[in-house]
Regions:
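Acidic/polar surface patches and capping/hinge elements
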Residues: 143-548
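Extracellular/luminal regions of secreted and cell-surface proteins that mediate adhesion/ECM remodeling
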Residues: 1-144
Length: 548
């Protein structure tokens, strides 16, 4: 046969970081597996993915703006291309290429979660070389942090995978619920070993000598397998990998893992009849001016009964429900709609001239995560928690509590948000703006050709889900680490773009503002959304998982 290049990963010399740090160094080994000499240029491409399947469709490329104006349409990311590397290999010979992410050819990943993701290497010979395309791609799992952070990443990857292709995906409130279930189980399993804090639900003693790390793995594995049964093979593989990396004795690992499974089963049982299975029941649109109308007309809006789901920590949804939006015919609402018309338009029209700045456009895209094949808004905030926890060097027990608090707060914030949405049933800006000539509000200007920069979600405007989730997560993170914490984070929506923050409250505000710039929420829906989220997050932090 002819020459045949095979690629595989060698040593990970320095663990790659998440953009924008741009640190990491890996070896890629290219081998001539054919029976003839290979002499010529090759290209080496590196990609990042949340799973073991490289999706070459709609890949983001680096570009002169490093992705700033090129939102990701697929799920995987091209990290760079080392071009025209001269290879001279006899049959059976290998050559090692060292990829340095601090160099100019490659950037560190943006679209993955730092706890667990895959690097892909692909070797492409020049046009004068025949190549077997079946074996010129290799992957390598990259992990960071302890088992809590790693399994948080596995959880986010599962949420993204659930929305790939024609799959239905995990809507934000459901994602927040699932995240809370997983991390409540991990927390109760880990906390049982030292009992330093109150349990969330399960108060049982672990077996003597059991491995606490294996207990965390067992809790994560069991909950994820129940929540995403079609991905069990992935969870099986990660379970085996996690247990192999634990240095405790096999008997201790088994005892710990089984204990974690036992804890998880009790958490899952407690959520069996929480109302989530009935949340998509029917919805009848209102007929009054200002009532939400499904988008597109006649469709079923998302989760109209989610406000009836049993909360994880708060006592009553009504305790956190805001007073509501201004009257549809009021001058205040008219001014709000005019703000969105000018800031949130997709294109200029005969009526509307966009006033949004390039930075505001980037903010809208950066925080979107509306596509089914992303981590979704609650998951994006979990990635923020991962980044900060890794930077702070928090312990296993601290991470178990941190992620439980963040996700319990997000889950309850989502329930309050959806209760509020369908209580007040406020129409979306796109409907109001396109029909404003008939709304009897002198403050508004109708524009039938107007469209929002971001796709408008199919559920009511007030209050903003993004804002509520951001407020809740930011409040927990601020209480845990201190609000004035500086950090940089990337986005799945804009590979190669990172934004910098000097506080968690700044992050929450920008996430909320993004929905105005995206044209999908009026300002008050975001202002009240952040406040509701902060109230829920503060309550959760002050009332559950407290020190003993």
């Amino acid at each position: 046969m002819a020459s045949d290049l095979v690629v595989q990963f060698g040593n990970i010399l320095e663990q790659p970081t998440i953009f924008p740090t741009e640190k990491g160094k890996v070896n890629v080994v290219v081998t001539n597996q054919g029976d003839t000499q290979l002499n010529g240029p090759v290209n080496l491409k590196l990609y990042a993915s949340t799973d073991k399947e490289l999706d070459n469709n709609n890949l983001n490329t680096l570009g002169p703006e490093r992705g700033a104006n090129d939102p990701l349409k697929g799920t995987d990311e091209l990290l760079g291309n080392l071009q025209n590397q001269n290879i001279n290999l006899a049959p059976g010979q290998s050559q090692t290429i060292t990829v340095d992410f601090a160099g100019s050819e490659f950037r560190t990943p943006s679209v993955v979660s730092p706890g667990a993701y895959y690097l892909f290497a692909e070797v492409e010979p020049g046009s004068n070389i025949t190549e077997n395309k079946a074996n010129n791609v290799a992957n390598q799992l990259i992990t960071q942090g302890d088992v809590v952070i790693q399994w948080n990443a596995i959880l986010l990857n599962a949420i993204q995978t659930s929305g790939k292709g024609d799959a239905s995906g995990t809507p934000p409130p459901i994602g927040a619920r699932n995240q809370a279930i997983v991390h409540a189980a991990i927390y109760d399993a880990v906390n049982a070993f030292d009992g330093s804090h109150k349990p969330y639900l399960v108060d049982i003693d672990p077996p003597a000598g059991a491995s606490v790390q294996a207990a965390a793995v067992g809790a994560a594995y069991q909950t994820l397998k129940s929540l995403y049964p079609t991905q069990t093979a992935t969870f099986d593989e990660q379970r085996d990998r996690s247990l192999n990396e634990i240095i405790d004795a096999p008997v201790a690992e088994k005892a710990g893992f089984d204990f974690g499974v036992k804890v998880a089963d009790q958490i899952l049982a407690a959520r069996t009849n929480d109302g989530s299975a009935q949340a998509q029941r029917g919805y009848t649109p209102g007929t009054d001016p200002g009532d939400f109308q499904p988008i597109p007309p006649g469709s079923q809006p998302l989760l109209p009964q989610w406000g009836l789901v049993t909360p994880f920590a708060i006592r009553s949804v009504a305790d956190f429900r805001p007073e509501g939006p201004p009257e549809f015919s009021s001058p205040l609402y008219g001014r709000e709609i005019e703000t969105v018309r000018q800031l949130g338009a997709k294109n200029d029209t005969a009526v509307t001239k966009i006033t949004r700045t390039p930075d505001q456009t980037e903010i809208a895209q950066f925080w979107a995560n509306d596509r089914d094949d992303t981590f979704r808004p609650p998951g994006q905030l979990n990635e923020v928690a991962q980044e900060v926890a890794l930077a702070k060097g928090t312990t296993l027990a601290e991470n178990a509590r941190l992620f439980a608090l963040v996700n319990i707060a997000e889950a309850d914030a989502g329930i309050v948000a959806w209760d509020t949405k369908y209580t007040y049933d406020q129409l979306r800006p796109i409907t109001a703006i396109q029909n404003a000539d008939n709304d009897n509000n002198p403050q508004t200007k109708g524009d039938p050709q107007w469209d929002s920069l971001l796709a408008t979600p199919n559920f009511p405007d007030y209050i903003s889900g993004h804002s509520v989730f951001a407020g809740a997560a930011a409040q927990v993170l601020a209480n845990f680490f201190g609000d004035n914490t500086s950090f940089d984070i990337p986005s799945q929506e804009l590979p190669g773009v990172a934004r910098s923050y000097s506080s968690f409250s700044q992050l929450a505000q920008e996430d909320a503002d993004s929905r105005i710039y995206g044209g999908v929420h009026v300002p008050l829906a975001t202002v009240d959304g952040v406040l509701v989220g902060q109230n829920v997050g503060g309550f959760v932090f002050d009332n559950v998982l407290k020190p003993i």
